[in-house]
């Protein structure tokens, strides 16, 4: 491609969210920035957000951040992101606007600017019980409005695409599956010194399986806690994630069943420490009831861990055929699957190597190239 394309991005989550939507946005924009094509990447955020997140991509080639001109109140920031941003996009001659977190501003279609939206999941429609009633209604309304505005929709898994087609009644030609890549830090092997520093910092046990993700009902980590009762007594579970009200339920179970010496819950863990945490675990456990994709699975496999997940959504797409999957309500089955992938289990190393080969399809350059082809197609 010879002519430069100016791409605008919804960067609110990029500068505010450490995991999930924020991680997706930062990784994709970084991968696009390193393509050899002539691109201008303009990131539109209502404010500068968190320095430690913005700095991960600020200063990369072709990237510039854009903010509202005035010093505005929070409700005005929301209005700007919802509609007012379109004026700035037109002024900046943006050709394609990409809503990275399932939303597009009102009026984007009328402006003549082409638009792409990434839909991560439709859990608020599939499982509204995991959301406050009003939140589920708002998310559903935004989804239906957004798919009418979008020129093209990216689903981050085949599972999400099926949900979009069924629940959004969208023409299949408007939806493409483009998987998510993980941050490059997970492909670098931590040094023994780095591992020991992290072990001492968090007081890690000698043997453990790991879970990473928000500690919420949908993520279902209580199943992992219950599975520990059927696993060797020298094996622990380390849970890394943001606390929610569900965390209290997990803590109550741990206390009632005297598992406090075998279950460790860590929060506010910096991204930089995660590779060393993964590297010291024996396996990764991800018993989520429903996901849009499951990027921690890719991170774990990149770090050389076997994975045990649950059936029922998209986790088989992320983990591939050499990860193990059980029903999300069967702690005994989860315990049995974990036993199959602990150190010393037959075929463990071969399973890890095949899984590493499988996740090559999620490499950042390939993902960025697929997204760029969508931009070019709709122009």
Ranges and model annotations:
Residues 1-379:
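Carbohydrate transferase catalytic cores enriched for Leloir-type hexosyltransferases
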